[in-house]
Amino acid sequence: MTKRCSWVKMSNPLYITYHDEEWGQPLHDDQALFELLCMETYQAGLSWETVLNKRQAFREAFHGYHIQAVAEMTDTELENLLENPAIIRNRAKIFATRANAQAFLRLQAEYGSFDAYLWSFVEGKTVVNDVLDYRQSPAKTALSKKLAKDLKKRGFKFTGPVAVLSFLQAVGLVDDHENDCEWKSGH
Protein backbone atom coordinates (compact mmCIF):
# COMPACT_ATOMS: atom_id res chain seq x y z
CA MET A 1 0.00 0.00 0.00
CA THR A 2 1.24 3.48 -0.90
CA LYS A 3 2.33 5.51 2.14
CA ARG A 4 1.55 9.22 1.95
CA CYS A 5 1.71 12.05 4.46
CA SER A 6 -1.11 11.66 6.98
CA TRP A 7 -2.58 15.10 6.13
CA VAL A 8 -3.65 13.91 2.67
CA LYS A 9 -7.44 13.68 2.48
CA MET A 10 -7.83 10.27 0.84
CA SER A 11 -11.49 10.94 -0.01
CA ASN A 12 -10.54 13.79 -2.39
CA PRO A 13 -8.74 12.81 -5.63
CA LEU A 14 -7.54 16.42 -6.08
CA TYR A 15 -5.80 16.22 -2.71
CA ILE A 16 -4.10 12.92 -3.58
CA THR A 17 -2.93 14.22 -6.97
CA TYR A 18 -1.71 17.47 -5.41
CA HIS A 19 0.36 15.56 -2.85
CA ASP A 20 1.70 12.96 -5.27
CA GLU A 21 2.47 15.17 -8.27
CA GLU A 22 3.03 18.65 -6.95
CA TRP A 23 3.51 19.31 -3.23
CA GLY A 24 7.14 19.37 -2.22
CA GLN A 25 8.49 18.98 -5.75
CA PRO A 26 11.21 21.58 -6.42
CA LEU A 27 9.58 24.14 -8.69
CA HIS A 28 11.44 26.64 -10.84
CA ASP A 29 8.80 27.98 -13.24
CA ASP A 30 7.85 31.56 -12.36
CA GLN A 31 4.25 31.29 -13.55
CA ALA A 32 3.70 28.10 -11.52
CA LEU A 33 5.40 29.73 -8.51
CA PHE A 34 3.06 32.70 -8.86
CA GLU A 35 -0.01 30.45 -8.99
CA LEU A 36 0.97 28.58 -5.83
CA LEU A 37 1.84 31.82 -4.03
CA CYS A 38 -1.63 33.11 -4.88
CA MET A 39 -3.26 29.87 -3.72
CA GLU A 40 -1.51 30.15 -0.36
CA THR A 41 -2.77 33.72 0.02
CA TYR A 42 -6.34 32.57 -0.68
CA GLN A 43 -6.07 29.93 2.05
CA ALA A 44 -5.72 32.45 4.90
CA GLY A 45 -8.51 31.50 7.32
CA LEU A 46 -9.78 28.65 5.14
CA SER A 47 -8.98 25.00 4.54
CA TRP A 48 -6.54 23.96 1.83
CA GLU A 49 -9.23 21.68 0.43
CA THR A 50 -11.49 24.69 -0.19
CA VAL A 51 -8.76 26.42 -2.19
CA LEU A 52 -7.78 23.26 -4.06
CA ASN A 53 -11.39 22.62 -5.07
CA LYS A 54 -11.62 26.16 -6.52
CA ARG A 55 -8.23 26.09 -8.22
CA GLN A 56 -9.47 25.78 -11.80
CA ALA A 57 -11.98 28.59 -11.31
CA PHE A 58 -9.20 30.81 -9.93
CA ARG A 59 -7.06 30.01 -12.99
CA GLU A 60 -9.89 31.09 -15.25
CA ALA A 61 -10.60 34.23 -13.23
CA PHE A 62 -6.96 35.31 -13.21
CA HIS A 63 -5.97 34.76 -16.85
CA GLY A 64 -4.25 31.43 -16.21
CA TYR A 65 -2.01 33.26 -13.74
CA HIS A 66 -0.14 34.99 -16.55
CA ILE A 67 1.67 37.44 -14.32
CA GLN A 68 1.63 40.46 -16.63
CA ALA A 69 -2.09 40.03 -17.38
CA VAL A 70 -2.91 39.79 -13.67
CA ALA A 71 -0.75 42.83 -12.89
CA GLU A 72 -2.71 44.83 -15.47
CA MET A 73 -6.20 43.86 -14.26
CA THR A 74 -8.39 46.89 -13.64
CA ASP A 75 -10.32 47.65 -10.47
CA THR A 76 -13.51 46.94 -12.44
CA GLU A 77 -12.28 43.49 -13.47
CA LEU A 78 -11.37 42.70 -9.88
CA GLU A 79 -14.70 44.02 -8.57
CA ASN A 80 -16.51 41.80 -11.10
CA LEU A 81 -14.74 38.76 -9.64
CA LEU A 82 -16.57 39.43 -6.37
CA GLU A 83 -19.71 38.21 -8.19
CA ASN A 84 -18.09 34.90 -9.22
CA PRO A 85 -19.43 32.12 -6.93
CA ALA A 86 -16.80 29.66 -8.21
CA ILE A 87 -13.97 31.45 -6.38
CA ILE A 88 -13.37 32.74 -2.87
CA ARG A 89 -15.00 36.17 -3.01
CA ASN A 90 -12.84 38.01 -0.54
CA ARG A 91 -12.16 41.54 -1.79
CA ALA A 92 -8.83 41.90 0.01
CA LYS A 93 -7.53 38.59 -1.37
CA ILE A 94 -8.72 39.33 -4.90
CA PHE A 95 -7.06 42.75 -4.93
CA ALA A 96 -3.94 41.25 -3.28
CA THR A 97 -3.58 38.96 -6.30
CA ARG A 98 -3.01 41.99 -8.55
CA ALA A 99 -0.70 43.67 -6.01
CA ASN A 100 1.31 40.46 -5.73
CA ALA A 101 1.59 40.18 -9.52
CA GLN A 102 2.96 43.72 -9.64
CA ALA A 103 5.44 42.99 -6.83
CA PHE A 104 6.36 39.71 -8.55
CA LEU A 105 7.21 41.58 -11.78
CA ARG A 106 9.44 43.99 -9.84
CA LEU A 107 11.31 41.04 -8.33
CA GLN A 108 11.70 39.44 -11.75
CA ALA A 109 13.20 42.67 -13.05
CA GLU A 110 15.61 42.87 -10.12
CA TYR A 111 16.69 39.20 -9.95
CA GLY A 112 16.06 37.98 -13.50
CA SER A 113 13.38 35.62 -12.17
CA PHE A 114 11.30 35.09 -9.06
CA ASP A 115 12.82 31.61 -8.98
CA ALA A 116 16.34 33.06 -8.56
CA TYR A 117 15.14 35.36 -5.79
CA LEU A 118 13.30 32.60 -3.96
CA TRP A 119 15.95 29.88 -4.14
CA SER A 120 18.62 32.35 -2.96
CA PHE A 121 17.04 32.04 0.50
CA VAL A 122 18.08 28.35 0.64
CA GLU A 123 21.28 28.62 -1.43
CA GLY A 124 19.61 26.65 -4.22
CA LYS A 125 19.09 23.51 -2.12
CA THR A 126 15.92 22.04 -0.64
CA VAL A 127 15.81 22.09 3.16
CA VAL A 128 14.87 18.56 4.25
CA ASN A 129 13.26 18.44 7.68
CA ASP A 130 12.78 15.50 10.01
CA VAL A 131 8.97 15.15 10.20
CA LEU A 132 7.55 12.22 12.13
CA ASP A 133 4.04 13.69 12.30
CA TYR A 134 2.98 16.86 10.47
CA ARG A 135 0.85 17.91 13.46
CA GLN A 136 4.06 18.43 15.44
CA SER A 137 5.68 20.62 12.79
CA PRO A 138 5.97 24.35 13.40
CA ALA A 139 3.52 26.68 11.65
CA LYS A 140 6.36 29.08 10.85
CA THR A 141 10.15 28.93 10.86
CA ALA A 142 13.08 31.33 10.85
CA LEU A 143 13.23 30.90 7.06
CA SER A 144 9.53 31.65 6.54
CA LYS A 145 9.76 34.68 8.84
CA LYS A 146 12.77 36.03 6.94
CA LEU A 147 11.14 35.56 3.53
CA ALA A 148 7.77 36.93 4.72
CA LYS A 149 9.48 40.05 6.04
CA ASP A 150 11.27 40.60 2.73
CA LEU A 151 8.12 39.96 0.67
CA LYS A 152 6.17 42.45 2.78
CA LYS A 153 8.90 45.05 2.32
CA ARG A 154 8.56 44.52 -1.44
CA GLY A 155 4.79 45.07 -1.46
CA PHE A 156 3.40 41.54 -1.27
CA LYS A 157 0.10 40.99 0.55
CA PHE A 158 -1.21 38.02 2.59
CA THR A 159 2.32 36.60 2.77
CA GLY A 160 2.87 36.24 6.49
CA PRO A 161 5.26 33.61 7.86
CA VAL A 162 2.60 30.86 8.11
CA ALA A 163 1.42 31.30 4.50
CA VAL A 164 5.04 31.59 3.37
CA LEU A 165 6.02 28.32 5.08
CA SER A 166 3.10 26.58 3.35
CA PHE A 167 4.30 28.06 0.07
CA LEU A 168 7.91 26.96 0.67
CA GLN A 169 6.67 23.43 1.36
CA ALA A 170 4.42 23.42 -1.71
CA VAL A 171 7.16 24.52 -4.12
CA GLY A 172 9.87 22.25 -2.74
CA LEU A 173 12.20 24.69 -1.03
CA VAL A 174 11.33 22.89 2.19
CA ASP A 175 10.69 19.13 2.23
CA ASP A 176 8.26 18.55 5.07
CA HIS A 177 6.91 15.23 3.83
CA GLU A 178 6.55 12.91 6.79
CA ASN A 179 9.55 10.60 7.18
CA ASP A 180 7.60 7.47 6.20
CA CYS A 181 5.98 9.09 3.15
CA GLU A 182 7.11 7.60 -0.16
CA TRP A 183 7.59 11.14 -1.53
CA LYS A 184 10.13 12.15 1.15
CA SER A 185 13.54 13.09 -0.29
CA GLY A 186 15.85 10.10 -0.07
CA HIS A 187 13.02 7.76 0.97
Language-model segments: what does each one mean?
Residues 1-187:
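HhH-family (HhH-GPD) DNA N-glycosylase catalytic core used in base-excision repair
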